[in-house]
Amino acid sequence: MGPHSWLPLFMQLALLGPQWALHFYKVKVFVVPHSHMDVGWLHTVQESMQVYVPDVYNSVVEALTRGKRRRFIAVEQEYFRLWWDGFASAKRKQQVRQLLAEQRLEFVLGGQVMHDEAVTHFDDQILQLTEGHGFLYETFGIRPQFSWQVDPFGASATTPTLLALAGFNGHIISRIDYDLKDTMQHTQGLQFVWRGSRSLEARQEIFTHVLDQYSYCSDGFMWNGSPRFPDRPFDMDYSAVEMPVSQDSMNHYVLNLVDNVNKRAAWFRTQHVLWPWGCDRQFFNASQQFANMDRLMDHINKHTPELGISMQYATLAEYFQAVFAQDVSWQVRDHRDFLPYSSAPEQTWTGFYTSQSGLKRLARRASALLYAGESLFTRYMLSAAHRFLDPAWALTQLQQLRWAVSEVQHHDGITGTHILAVRDMFVEHLTTGMAGVRKLMDSIAQDMPLTHSGPEPGGHVAMVYNPLAWTVTTVITLTVSFPEVSVTDESGRPVLAQVQDSKETPSAYDLHVLTTIPGLSYQHYIIKPIRKAREDSQEAAATVPSTIQFGLKLRRQDGQVGRNLVPVKNSCYTVFLDKDTNLMHSIWERQSNRTVRMSQEFLAYRSVYGYEEAVTSDNYLFTPNGTAEPAWAAVRMEVVEGQLLSEIRQYFYRQANDSDHTYAIYSRLAHGPQDSAGELLCHRIEQEYRVGPLELNHEVVLRTSTSLNTGLVLYSDNNGYQMQRRTYRHDRNNSVSLNYYPMAQSAFIQDGGSRLVLLSEQAHGVSSQGNGQVEVMLHRRLWNKLEWTLQYNLTHDVTSVVRPVLWLLLGPRTLTTGLRQRSGLELQHRPVVLFRELGGTVQNGPGPRKQEPVTLPPSLHLQILSIPGWKYSSNHTVHLKNLQKGHYRRAKADFRRVLLRLHHLYEAGEHQALSRPVTLNLQSVLRGLGSVVAVEERSLTGTWDVNSLHRWSWKTEDGHHHRGSSRRPLPPLRGPNVTIHPKEIRTFFIHFQEQ
């Protein structure tokens, strides 16, 4: 293009006005090439690997090798690992190592997936980051330092805290409320220092960048077309979306890009513009992409004086380094999150908090099984003898479930925002992984010492394992086929048990057994049918409760309630039931001596149906057509009163003449020991629900209405890590959906005298739509005619029945504050029951010794106890030398190095006693596992020695200029003593002596 042909373009740029003039000669554009590769959304992982993923990595590596200035960031490690292990040639692998050494290829975030931030539990966020970081560090010796959370539907305040603990220096998010983003753009507030934890504050702050309204895609600058499913073209001939950059098209591209850049530059405080270049499933033909951008970039840089911008390819590290070098004091954001997320008026993304409820439950149960399997395997491997187990095989079983649990944390995975084939993929991977870990635990159970002398063969041995690091007293429930049963411990002593008709299966029986198990320990129970023919039998039978039936009652609208009450109680609560309605009426709580009015019922929101132009509920959105209405017409009730527990069974019928119920509430109160061991068991009402199948375009909630004067204030958790205060937001058209929040593990409402806590074993949407009310969305069934839904079969027309579980805690704040966290963990990590046949007299040989319990103080939680099986040296210098020499190929897993993570459960100032720092001697606490010979403190995911971790220090407007670190600035760890402060998560490598 000659000088005269340049004049028309220059005139057009001048017409852009003051905005362009403002940034004349100033703007530096950092072009960050990337490909957004969903680990399951519209296509399965297998389909994506078949169609385009290997082409992305192969062509990107080739393109970067051909051009020294080119850059690329890679995000999802599940895809990269699959390519590295199954597709990459030796040449490609060497090229990757060279590009990493030159810092032209950068791994950002580094997890297995780009995890969701609303409905994931922080345990699983840490897991998926740990798995990805471990692979990258072991393979390349690198440690990601910048995040790329650009597609999750809202941003939690927990994620930035975890990333800071992992050693990150910068955090990128995108999807926040459209109106808030617009305000932040116009006030240049898209960049800030985020202190995501109210207790950790500046110690774990992180610089955060919110992508502007253009987000992570660069529309109009994609030259490699779109991948073709289900099969890639044999000749790799993809029709390009955009016309190539040429002399004829140059003016078009320059004008559009400069206009775009100058708009963006006005929204930020520095003249450094982050320009994400890429989008979903891009760069599978990277040479074509880079060839066009090279020409455009060369032209713009040649005319920088006229255009006022310069461009360069960049990694995130290069962009953040440039911003960090600026003399700017940044705004500080506190522990508030960015939830819920709205993309437009009346488009609030709160439906996915409940979508695919069954998958959400399976994912959380898989995580709990993995947690138990990790610690049981660790105890077993550290014991004196392990006769039957191949450690390599065992590690493979754990690894498969680690990957499956990590995979489903993807922001289109556990969210339920995927097609049904992808759901089936997640389910298959989770169930296969769970079967492997269950087989591993069964193998360990076979090797556990058991001495039992029985008069005759028959029955089963149940090994019940407590994966928590404190003594748990609880009731386990087993399903048996016989109504008369005895339960004894391995010494033959009778155990308190209760057998009753199954609440769901007419031909079976529920056997409830009271158990007390120390931390990381197990108990054996012998379960045998009692034979009536033996009249002289001395076997102690499980007790049989009495059952009272209450006839069908129609839903009443006259408000005449509370005249005929039936009490059901244990030592902590009395639940009053109304015989005239068959509904809960109120609860009396012992410690406060207060009776709180409380009723529960199922209601349904109806969504707009069938209209192509309407905004309607789908996998993502919750857009109800009005307020919730009762979803039932009649209810029947049973009360089962026993020595061990009392159970209230309420069956709700959609129509009064229905033969089968659609909904049910099963409420249990346990009659446990009256000492401190039974405190948690006594102070909870365990509820299980049956919901479904639903009518089409119905979204069903359980609403609990109380006499608490809550002022429409709700508290819900961020990923099970911390609580957020939610005040009611009024909106003319969208108040219902706008006031729904994710409940990953807990929520509560309160007034000056009492607090009602809900604990959940899986994620749900939760809301308070009225004073004293809290409602939990349990299930959804949706279908519409929107083009998007029909094109991809992205439907939520599920006819399943779901059985979620909630535990209720009621009492004064001091009581519930002390119990909420530990009760939530007892729900999340219930004892695991492992069965085996009992054949006459059993006297096992000298297997692993009966091990000592591991017990932590009540304010600390053993977040993980695991043998990761990593092969790398803990010494970074040694590890890099081993990589250079190729020694990693011959390295073996270290089974004496244990990953230990401790979490302080309480916020600073939350509880008078439990919020204090806790000092403990790790050598003493872990003596039940073996002899500790060395303790190393590590970053959250284990890849950094904290003594060598020095994160960037960002200047802030409040005057703090604090050098961030992965922990409280204390002297280096010397010896086994460690102090854990409120909300800290501390990670260690514990090295045990060889037996």
From Swiss-Prot:
Record-level GO BP terms: mannose metabolic process
Residue ranges, annotated region (Disordered): 956-977
The protein's Enzyme Commission number: 3.2.1.24
Stored InterPro entries: Gal_mutarotase_sf_dom (IPR011013), Glyco_hydro/deAcase_b/a-brl (IPR011330), Glyco_hydro_38_C (IPR011682), Glyco_hydro_38_cen (IPR015341), Glyco_hydro_38_cen_sf (IPR037094), Glyco_hydro_38_N (IPR000602), Glyco_hydro_38_N_sf (IPR027291), Glyco_hydro_57/38_cen_sf (IPR028995)
A GO term for molecular function: alpha-mannosidase activity
Glycosylation (residues): 285, 593, 625, 657, 733, 793, 875, 977
Pfam families: Alpha-mann_mid, Glyco_hydro_38C, Glyco_hydro_38N
SS bonds (residue pairs): none
PTM field: Processed into a 27 kDa fragment localized on the equatorial segment and the apical rim of the head of mature sperm.
EC class of the enzyme, as a word: hydrolase
Active site: 151
Keywords, sorted A to Z: Glycoprotein, Glycosidase, Hydrolase, Metal-binding, Secreted, Signal, Zinc
pH dependence comment: Optimum pH is 6.5.
Reactions mediated catalytically: Hydrolysis of terminal, non-reducing alpha-D-mannose residues in alpha-D-mannosides
Signal peptide: 1-21
Record localization: Secreted
A GO cellular component entry from the record: extracellular region
Cofactor annotation comment: Binds 1 zinc ion per subunit.
UniProt-annotated binding residues for Zn(2+): 36, 38, 151, 411
Principal subcellular localisation of the protein: secreted
Function: Can digest both p-nitro-phenyl-alpha-D-mannoside and high mannose oligosaccharide (Man(8)-GlcNAc(2)). May be involved in sperm maturation. Has a possible role in specific sperm-egg interaction since sperm surface mannosidase acts like a receptor for mannose-containing oligosaccharides located on the zona pellucida.
PANTHER family: ALPHA-MANNOSIDASE (PTHR11607), EPIDIDYMIS-SPECIFIC ALPHA-MANNOSIDASE (PTHR11607:SF28)
Name under which the protein is recorded: Epididymis-specific alpha-mannosidase
